[in-house]
């Protein structure tokens, strides 16, 4: 997968930013319930014109590079969306890795293993590094771009003041937003997919889907694999306008 600065069209963001000033506090006490304090991984010094490619290796070095690339690409994408709408963009403060349950806390609550979350109280993304490396090796490097894109989308929901009554609505919208970020990045030339990357997205969504018997309205529901795939690829193919941002 690759990363090259690309120009985005005017997105459906402007009308939501004013509401965000009032509503952003709704999520300030906790974190999204994940798929699942250290400094953030250093930002890459690569020039913006360079294309990021996931080379398919499964080394720890490649994992770290893909995490950095995914965060940088998401930050650049959302900065462009806000800028195109004439709004100020504030990036998520940091991304932290952890390896033990409770090692990182959000609003006083220790984060569980085998997870990745966005903590609105601290405005950071945290992920279980052991779980993430295992998924990276089993599913592929494209999964990391989806995973970080999904969590980054939760941060954008907070900035836009988007809050639904049920968790599943919040989660499926974040899947759609992650799909839009990746699809738009591919179309603009900012991201270059390798053979098999789309299949890795599908496999990743299958891996994080809820049990089909999970109640739609249950707290913490994210959606079945089918629902999550539909939301992701709707955003991937149709961009942010298909994600119900306003």
Segment roles from a protein language model:
Residues 68-71, 75, 81-83, 178-211:
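Short helix/loop segments within enzyme catalytic domains
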Residues 100-126:
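Catalytic zinc-binding patch centered on the HExxH motif and its immediate surroundings
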Residues 152-168, 181-186:
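Catalytic Zn2+-binding segment of zinc metalloproteases
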Residues 129-146, 162-168:
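Short pre-active-site segment immediately N-terminal to the catalytic Zn-binding motif
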Residues 78, 146-159, 175, 179:
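Active-site recognition of the HExxH zinc-binding catalytic motif
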Residues 23-25:
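C-terminal motif of bacterial Sec signal peptides marking the signal peptidase cleavage site
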Residues 213-246:
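Pan-zinc metallopeptidase signature
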Residues 27-31:
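Bacterial signal peptide processing site
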């Amino acid at each position: 997968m690759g990363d090259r600065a690309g120009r985005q069209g005017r997105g459906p963001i402007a009308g939501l930013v004013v509401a965000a000033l009032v509503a952003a506090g709704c999520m300030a006490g906790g974190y999204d319930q994940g798929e699942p304090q250290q400094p953030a991984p250093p930002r890459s010094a690569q020039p913006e014109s360079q294309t990021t490619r996931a080379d398919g290796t499964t080394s720890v070095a490649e994992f770290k590079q893909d995490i950095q690339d995914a965060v940088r690409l998401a930050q650049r994408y959302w900065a462009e969306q806000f800028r195109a709408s004439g709004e100020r963009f504030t990036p998520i403060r940091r991304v932290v890795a952890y390896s033990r349950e409770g090692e990182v806390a959000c609003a006083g609550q220790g984060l569980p293993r085998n997870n990745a979350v966005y903590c609105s109280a601290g405005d950071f993304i945290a992920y279980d590094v052991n779980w993430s490396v295992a998924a990276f090796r089993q599913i592929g490097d494209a999964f990391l771009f989806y995973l970080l894109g999904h969590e980054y989308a939760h941060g954008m929901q907070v900035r836009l003041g988007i809050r639904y009554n049920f968790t599943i609505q919040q989660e499926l919208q974040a899947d759609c937003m992650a799909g839009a970020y990746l699809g738009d990045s591919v179309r603009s030339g900012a991201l270059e997919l390798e053979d098999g990357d789309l299949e890795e997205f599908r496999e990743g969504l299958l891996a994080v889907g809820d049990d089909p018997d999970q109640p739609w309205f249950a707290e913490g529901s994210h959606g079945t694999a089918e629902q999550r795939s539909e939301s992701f690829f709707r955003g991937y193919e149709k961009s942010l306008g298909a994600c119900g941002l306003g």
